[in-house]
Amino acid sequence: MPKRTDIHKIMVIGSGPIIIGQAAEFDYSGTQACLALRDEGYEVVLVNSNPATIMTDTTIADKVYIEPLTVDSVSRIIRQEYPDAILPTLGGQVGLNMALALAKTGILDELHIELLGTKLASIEQAEDREKFKELCQKLGEPVPPSKTVKIVEDALAFGDEIGYPIIVRPAFTMGGTGGGICHNHDELAEIAKNGLELSPVTECLIEKSIAGYKEIEFEVMRDSSDNAMIVCCMENFDPVGIHTGDSIVFSPSQTLSDKEYQMLRDCSLKLIRALKIEGGCNVQLALDPNSLDYDVIEVNPRVSRSSALASKATGYPIAKMAAKIAIGMTLDEIKNPVTGTTYAEFEPALDYVVCKIPRFPFDKFPKADRVLGTQMKATGEVMAIGRTAEEAMQKAVQSLEIDEKDLYSAKAHKASDDEIEQKLVRPQDDRLFYLAEAFRRGYSLEDVHELTKINFYFLDVVKHMVEMEKEIEANPDDLDVLRLAKKYGFSDQTIAKLWHEYPDQVRDLRKANGIVPVYKMVDTCAAEFESTTPYFYSTYDGENESRKSGKKSVIVIGSGPIRIGQGVEFDYATVHSVKALQKMGYEAIVINSNPETVSTDFSVSDKLYFEPLTLEDVLNVCDLEQPEGVIVQFGGQTSINLAAGLERHGVKILGTTVKDLDRAEDREEFDQIIKSLHLHQPQGLTATTHEGVMKAADQLGYPVLVRPSYVLGGKAMEIVYSKDELEEYLHDHADIAEDHPILVDDYLDGRECDVDAISDGKTVLLPGIMEHIEHAGVHSGDSMAVYPPQTFSDEVEEKITDVTKKLALALNCKGIMNIQFIVRDGDVYVIEVNPRASRTVPFLSKITGIEMAQVATRVIMGESLEQQGYADGLAPEPEMISVKAPVFSFSKLADVDSYLGPEMKSTGEVMGSDHTFAKALYKAFAGAKMQLPENGNVLLTIEDRDKEKILPIAKRFARIGYRIFATKGTANFLKKNDLHVELVTKVHEDEQADDNILNELRDGKIDLVINTMGHDIEKNSDGFIIRQMAIQQNVPLLTALDTADALLKSLENRSFATDALK
């Protein structure tokens, strides 16, 4: 059926900020969908609150609204734009839930707006646990015994009836939010209560656990003519019981017999047809490893995380196809863009193995609960492609950018047998390394299977790699063993370690004997049809399919997996760099390892290499492509860390030189530059021993800021107020080495700001200065920021501009850089310089209209700022005021302290823009789900040193009609200052009392918690427990008084003044 001509304007709802469970994959799918709809001639209106995405670029849709994803906000835009239809199935769970909420308000019926793609009834049938169960039973498809409940008591009664373990699955949530496995009555009571609170319809499915079954996923497509097809079948390495987002995944399935595959394929097709889904959907199934029994777990009636993985694994662009199906086209009339000759109804065939491994945030949160279950904890993922499962898995491990570069972990090696068995029975994020260690210690396949329930085939893959380690170690410099090792994915670094050599020696031996990788094409059809996709992976098997073209080429290194501190913002910069290179006539080549992102869409660059971002893999691509040079400024710390090694091997680093990159990052050299330019910076000392750190702190006087050098995202950075705290910090970060000294700085309390600057060596352009709303001490990635600045005088802005220009020229910056300042008493202090793109590039690019990554790329390639039409100094400020607010995923990470400090904790961001600061703040808070009633109850739990500062804030809350709750000390102080305060008892006082803090939170009496008890970082301390309870109960929580002040500004703007005349 040809595309529809009765609709002209389509609204696409985005997925909002990045949180655990909903990451960059929706930027990828949303971008694809918008472009596909525009290609077909429709006007596209996009609504999304996340400025860090390619999707919210003005080139992606005809109209782009970066506004809060609330019913009020989206309804206002609908009334402004009058779209004919809305496409909600590409914005993840947020987009789906928004469509349902809009339908309930009646606005869609009132304005005759149609929902494209999957119909509302189908969405409800798939997402509503009870309706879905009824459908499966009607179709004769098996589901585990279960019951839908709306109250905790019903959950407990059902648990007693069918026995434990039991799985709780809240309705209309994603990433396993609020769910979990319960082994007893108490766990079920707690998890069911939490799940009911987090489900937008207050409903949970309580089902008998089938943990231990194989977990299989099918990505399925269907059109309005009932053509349906399987895009991809994926098999989880981990059995049922671990969320698929936290599981290692292989495609195609590795252990299914043809009979099992066909049986599960038929079930998936039957389900998508019965649900009448139009577009893409994800079916999750559980298969008994010992029989042909299976159960249906769930269906996601939308494009999902797995769809992005399936798209990259097969080359089949699911979101693009789903968008075309939504406008009425059918699979037999849509061309497959990979081959250009076959149609979209042909099922992809793979002649390689894909392995996905999740990337977890526990390097940032060492105290978090790392045990994996049905609630997702990973922030991102990597994907690798090889000819064998071993090769794909090894390459994926190398892509993770963690301490382990292969299957050997020093921590696992030191563990006792008991500890290893514990880790296998209760799997954590690092289980793969403990599996390998178990085989090193002689555990049999049967032993390990008994402990883990992981399929024998996957265990054998791990065991084979451990056996290969021994063979490599026993045969140094043996060419046959080297060939075999490379075939199974062993890196030069690992081989060098086993041979007690340097990686360069292994590389030289390889190259001298012609042992070099070939590059194979990902073509969706296992080479059955002619294909010209510029999408490649390396392997040591067969002939090379990637040829160097005649054009001049430049390699842009991506930023790898999404993690806290290095998010989708860096992918945004990578994509824009590619666009600029293409406009300048260069062949733009991307190397990256992240399946969720736009940069790894093969239609974005001229050539895509899906490879680990290691020195070996990047050099191999450089050897083949012989580029003009490599750009490292846009891939965050990942690409910067590769610069020196690439240069050592003769690869030209474009833009700022390696020597100058080092001068910015090396503390002593940087201090010399600051001194020579007569600039201010907080007094600081460097120490390489624990004693040295203690001495430095005494010399400077507390509080001090301590951090390791060469870090991103403030990892292991803390403000320390006393000797005891410093000793605890050193105990927690005991791995300080000579080559990574600790920096100890005098902690300055002032206004912090961020500047991104572009320099060509003569002219320095400052697109804007972003003022932080929180005082210094909160990491810039976790701080709210406003542009243009609201409290800086012209004189201060001039000083910041002047210092930025001096530093850019002194550091010989060529391209982009980021500087962080503290402004105190009119003086400007330099905190740090990052000689690369920062996470603020997308935000600032969107609101200034200056495409910073593109301008910087042109500078890197030799085009001056003057030639591009930019003048020296600070760019003119726009009329609109824009606020960036961080978004956190604490509800997914048990035991992570939510108190904000110098170590970054946010996973995403939103933006609010308006003509006044208060309105921009209101939108930013609304986008970050911090919407408060006009009057309510606020709980104040304040450290003694903040008591004076809280007084004006408390008075303003009282003035707009809020009741104030506080514990004894704070309450007495506020009462003395004429405020009416409701007294609550402390955490460990009368725990049964109704007015105990925790009971007040549990009973839903509190609308906002302000908690500045930053020293209460122990898990049993009052401050920590209150913060955790607020997060569990979904109560907005602020830990910085500046944020409370900003929130008040937005609330005061909404409320009317009620002043007595007398």
Swiss-Prot record:
One of its GO terms (molecular function) is metal ion binding. Pathway: Amino-acid biosynthesis; L-arginine biosynthesis; carbamoyl phosphate from bicarbonate: step 1/1; Pyrimidine metabolism; UMP biosynthesis via de novo pathway; (S)-dihydroorotate from bicarbonate: step 1/3. Mn(2+) 4 binds at E832, N834. Mg(2+) 3 binds at Q820, E832. The large subunit is composed of 2 ATP-grasp domains that are involved in binding the 2 ATP molecules needed for carbamoyl phosphate synthesis. The N-terminal ATP-grasp domain (referred to as the carboxyphosphate synthetic component) catalyzes the ATP-dependent phosphorylation of hydrogencarbonate to carboxyphosphate and the subsequent nucleophilic attack by ammonia to form a carbamate intermediate. Residues 930-1062 are annotated as: Allosteric domain. Residues 402-546 are annotated as: Oligomerization domain. The keyword Transmembrane does not apply. It holds the Pfam family CPSase_L_D2. Composed of two chains; the small (or glutamine) chain promotes the hydrolysis of glutamine to ammonia, which is used by the large (or ammonia) chain to synthesize carbamoyl phosphate. Tetramer of heterodimers (alpha,beta)4. Mn(2+) 1 binds at Q284, E298. Keywords: Amino-acid biosynthesis, Arginine biosynthesis, ATP-binding, Ligase, Magnesium, Manganese, Metal-binding, Nucleotide-binding, Pyrimidine biosynthesis, Repeat. Belongs to the CarB family. Residues 133-327, 671-861 form the ATP-grasp domain. This is Carbamoyl phosphate synthase large chain. Mn(2+) 2 binds at E298, N300. It comes from the Bacteria.
